[in-house]
Structures are given as structure tokens and as C-alpha cells.
Amino acid sequence: MEASRFEKGSEALAAIDGKGGQAVIDSLQDIAPDLGRWIVEFAFGDIYTRKGLDLQQRELVTIGSLVTQGDTVPQLTVHIQGALNVGLSKAAVVEAILQCAPYVGFPRVINAINVARTVFERDTEDSDKPKD
């Protein structure tokens, strides 16, 4: 039996964003539970699980899209961490953001670089902690 869209999406979300992605979905349960379900089913169950691009490529496209939209700090935070989770280097994330500069301008790129810096610093702090 084929997995449901929600099951496929939940697996993809966990693989990419770990606890951060689930925290976003959980934060919507009290006010807009359908929105959380749509994110899991559509974005992660239908789109992220398609053939043609691997998870690293999908995260780069997502980061570029979020940079162009502007005012997406929470989403950029989750997806930059997701990019690291699926094996992209910090340098690749920075290059993807810099690639947006000629098309969306310096203010949005600077803002995104600052989000990346915060995620990278947190990632470094987490990796310095002893593992249980």
C-alpha cells in the first residue's frame, strides 16, 4: 500500500527539517491546523518527494525563493538549517543567497546572510555540545 501524502510529507519534513519543521507544524495546531496539514501534505508530501531534484537542490531552490520574497526570517531559518541537515555546506548556502543579489537587491540578500549567520552560529554551538 502506498503511503498517504501526509505520511510521505511527514517523513520528508523530518528528514529535512528535523524538530524545527515539526515545531512549525505544531505551532499552527491551535489556530490553523489545516494550514499545518497542507504544508505537510502539499509542500513536503507532493513537492519535496518528486523525482528530478534531490533534497539539497530543493533546499537551494527554496532558499532562493524565500530570499526573493523578503520578510521570511522564520522560514529562511528553518530551510537554511534544513539545507545543512541534508548535507549542504555553509559555503553553498551562502553562494545560493549571494546569487540572488543581482535579481532582488542587496537589502534582501544582506538580511538573508544575517539569517544564515545566526543559523550557522547556532549549528556550531550545537555541534560543540557533548553528545549523550
Predicted stretch roles:
Residues 58-66, 96-97:
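Short, structured motif recognition centered on aromatic/hydrophobic residues
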Residues 37-40, 70-76:
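Short acidic alpha-helix initiation/capping motifs at coil-to-helix transition points
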Residues 101-107:
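C-terminal structural segments of small proteins and small subunits
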Residues 1-56, 85, 109-132:
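Acidic, glycine/proline-rich low-complexity segments that act as flexible tails and inter-domain linkers
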Residues 65-72, 105:
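Short alpha-helix boundary/capping elements
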Residues 72-92, 108-119:
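Extended intrinsically disordered, low-complexity coil regions enriched in Ser, Thr, Gly, Ala
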Residues 12, 43, 78-79, 96:
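A general alpha-helix detector
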